[in-house]
Design a protein with these regions (language model features):
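Secreted, disulfide-rich extracellular signaling modules
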Residues: 2-6, 10-11, 18-396
């Protein structure tokens, strides 16, 4: 009798315990330790978490990045400078009259910004000799801020005026050099022993250009992409031969637009990014930060978008270059709200807080895969918002 009663009581006890486990735990606070269950929320709508937001331009040259930009779109202008390598030291006796034909060869890429009606881009351009030294560190202002005459010979040595088809694989653009171009090449052959005085050529878009087109060039450390090439057919000692010079120095120079005052812009090519200052003084000294979200609205009507989709991801990183890489974050685009939202900035704010900073600065920029391969612009109107979910740790 007592044995059966004991078994029955045990079964009832198990049933009671099992029924008590059927309720799912609450998702709010379930991941937090017992001493951190008093959660608090700070919102930038109530507390001045965002101290300031502004656009800044980074002086980052577009040198051997894999893409060259050439053309015009609105007030944006893109030029190309090329310096050629592998000029042999055996052609000093070749004159301009010995050069039968000289052709600059460029490989178009699929990307274009501007008018692409009819499946082609209209990017007429001229080729000019460069008359002074330029390095991979050069930017637009260091070359053209005071006009073209200080950097370029204003007499063109070749020109292109035909539409360039927009295809995944387009025929190369081949530009014949004129007699002045032949004379320039003969001068290069004579100067080969002092190649520092060979400054290369510039490709300058005509005012009638209606788009900016991308062309291929070498990426640093990668030799697979086609290079701009100068093909020279010449006669020497009664024989005709061909010389091919590769564009070892290839750089784009983009004149930034002057309409950025008071605007928040992200734009590759001209390297616009946004700097945001976050105030931390509203957080208790021993706060534990659990979640931080930044909401970034966009103005799609003010976008400049080429023939590729605009970037759906933004990169957020601390302005302090000494900060660890793991605290970087990303924001993804939500079409329903026309905004980007971060996954979490908790690690970044926790880093600032642990280093006793009352203000932290973060940079919003485009991801690396589009930073040098496009000229698209993303416009951010005022109205960024931030929320911080935190708890207070027990006082010691």
């Amino acid at each position: 009798m007592w044995h059966r009663t004991g078994i029955l009581c045990a079964c009832i006890g198990v049933a009671v315990v099992a029924s008590g486990c059927n309720d799912l735990p609450s998702s709010i606070g379930a991941e937090f330790l017992p001493d951190t269950t008093q959660l608090q929320v700070l919102s930038s709508e109530l507390v001045p978490l965002i101290e300031s937001v502004r656009t800044e331009q980074v002086a980052q040259p577009l040198f051997n990045t894999g893409w060259l930009f050439l053309g015009r779109y609105r007030e944006l202008e893109a030029r190309v400078l090329l310096r050629f390598v592998d000029i042999p030291d055996t052609l000093a006796g070749v004159t301009a009259e010995d050069i039968l034909e000289a052709t600059l060869i460029l490989s178009p890429e699929r990307y274009a910004l501007g008018d692409t009606a009819g499946g082609a881009t209209v990017v007429p351009f001229r080729i000019h000799p460069v008359v002074r030294f330029w390095s991979p560190l050069a930017i637009w202002d260091s070359l053209f801020a005071n006009g073209d005459a200080a950097t370029l010979d204003l007499t063109p040595i070749g020109s292109w005026n035909d539409p360039i088809p927009l295809r995944d694989s387009s025929e190369p653009v081949r530009v014949r050099l004129n007699a002045a171009g032949h004379a320039l090449l003969a001068e290069w052959f004579r100067r080969q022993a002092d190649s520092q005085s060979i400054y290369g050529v510039a490709l300058v878009p005509e005012p009638t250009a209606t788009s900016i087109r991308a062309f291929a060039t070498q990426t640093i450390g990668q030799l697979q992409r086609p290079l701009p090439t100068l093909e020279v057919l010449y006669r020497r000692a009664g024989r005709v031969d061909t010389l091919r010079l590769s564009g070892g120095y290839a750089s784009s120079f983009v004149r930034p637009p002057a309409d950025t005052a008071g605007k928040l812009l992200l734009q590759s090519g001209v390297q616009y990014r946004v700097r945001l200052r976050v105030r931390l003084d509203a957080l208790p000294p021993l706060a534990a930060i659990h979640q931080v979200q930044l909401w970034i609205p966009v103005d799609t009507a003010a976008f400049w978008t080429g023939n590729r989709e605009f970037s759906r991801v933004l990169r957020l990183m601390p302005a302090d270059s000494a900060a660890p890489g793991y605290i970087q974050a990303t924001a993804t685009y939500d079409a329903a709200t026309a905004s980007y939202a971060t996954k979490s900035l908790a690690a970044m704010l926790e880093f600032w807080l642990r280093h006793r900073r009352s203000v932290g600065e973060l940079l919003i920029t485009l991801p690396a895969d589009v930073l040098y391969s496009r000229l698209d612009r993303i416009a951010l109107p005022p109205g960024m918002r931030m929320w911080i979910l935190y708890s207070e740790r027990k006082q010691p």
